[in-house]
Amino acid sequence: MIYFDNAATSFYKPPQVVGAAVSTIKNLSVNAGRGGHFMSLKGARLMTSAREKIAAFFGAIDASFVIFTPGCTAALNTALFGLNLAGKHVITTALEHNSVLRPLFELKRRGDISLTVIN
């Protein structure tokens, strides 16, 4: 996973980012691909284009492997709870971010994994 979440809470945003966000909010506030109307289809095309550009940039073999989440915590939850970790032993450190530790502790509580936290 590539961590880009700090941009969501960082003070300085490049003018291009602000401009794109404002333009999208003003002109294209739709659920992309969730309907058959013009604006929804336009949003879907824009999202697909972004997904393809990101896939090409990172060398992903398929643009459908690129997913968008509201932030890093949601991405980590999706990954950790989506993996088949049943019966696995996970080793992490006490310095790990809370967004990783909490799902791991929950997986341990459920009995899905055994967990070692190194101090």
Task: Indicate residue ranges for each PLM-predicted region.
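Pyridoxal 5′-phosphate
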Residues: 1-119
